[in-house]
Amino acid sequence: MANEFRVCDDCQATNIKTLLPRLKEVDPDAKVEVGCQSYCGPGRKKSFAFVNNRPLSAPTEDELIDKVKKKIKK
């Protein structure tokens, strides 16, 4: 079963232009869905992504990528 990443293209703390390529580096075969995730509160202050239906957030994109690497299915 492939990994799935879901990210918002409207939240202030998430930079889609840099985050998407980094997620693809982590897992090139993952399904990626871009759109509102109804996670607006945390999305204003922290970078976030849903990984396999689990929300992950961190103060910086680098920290978020570290968390994503730990949560993906190998």
UniProtKB/Swiss-Prot annotation:
InterPro entries: DUF1450, UPF0741. Belongs to the UPF0741 family. This is UPF0741 protein YwzC. It comes from Bacillus subtilis (strain 168). The gene is ywzC.
